[in-house]
């Protein structure tokens, strides 16, 4: 029997791992849409909200941002 995952979203901790504050919601929205329409979640949880599940998967490294090199080029260089 698989263990249910209890999850508390900490967006600040997620930003430390993935420093692209505008990319995170886009990735989560796309994954949530996939879960809602056809994909099976990578985690087992009591929460049925696809957005919460997608945030959980991203924070637990089950999904990742593709083309991260392109996103790195968009980070402004502060002098």
UniProtKB/Swiss-Prot annotation:
<dbReference type="GO" id="GO:0000428">
    <property type="term" value="C:DNA-directed RNA polymerase complex"/>
</dbReference>
<comment type="function">
    <text>Promotes RNA polymerase assembly. Latches the N- and C-terminal regions of the beta' subunit thereby facilitating its interaction with the beta and alpha subunits.</text>
</comment>
<dbReference type="InterPro" id="IPR036161">
    <property type="entry name" value="RPB6/omega-like_sf"/>
</dbReference>
<dbReference type="GO" id="GO:0006351">
    <property type="term" value="P:DNA-templated transcription"/>
</dbReference>
<keyword id="KW-0808">Transferase</keyword>
<dbReference type="InterPro" id="IPR006110">
    <property type="entry name" value="Pol_omega/Rpo6/RPB6"/>
</dbReference>
<comment type="subunit">
    <text>The RNAP catalytic core consists of 2 alpha, 1 beta, 1 beta' and 1 omega subunit. When a sigma factor is associated with the core the holoenzyme is formed, which can initiate transcription.</text>
</comment>
<dbReference type="InterPro" id="IPR003716">
    <property type="entry name" value="DNA-dir_RNA_pol_omega"/>
</dbReference>
<dbReference type="Pfam" id="PF01192">
    <property type="entry name" value="RNA_pol_Rpb6"/>
</dbReference>
<dbReference type="GO" id="GO:0003899">
    <property type="term" value="F:DNA-directed RNA polymerase activity"/>
</dbReference>
<comment type="similarity">
    <text>Belongs to the RNA polymerase subunit omega family.</text>
</comment>
<protein>
    <recommendedName>
        <fullName>DNA-directed RNA polymerase subunit omega</fullName>
        <ecNumber>2.7.7.6</ecNumber>
    </recommendedName>
</protein>
<keyword id="KW-0240">DNA-directed RNA polymerase</keyword>
<keyword id="KW-0548">Nucleotidyltransferase</keyword>
<dbReference type="GO" id="GO:0003677">
    <property type="term" value="F:DNA binding"/>
</dbReference>
<keyword id="KW-0804">Transcription</keyword>
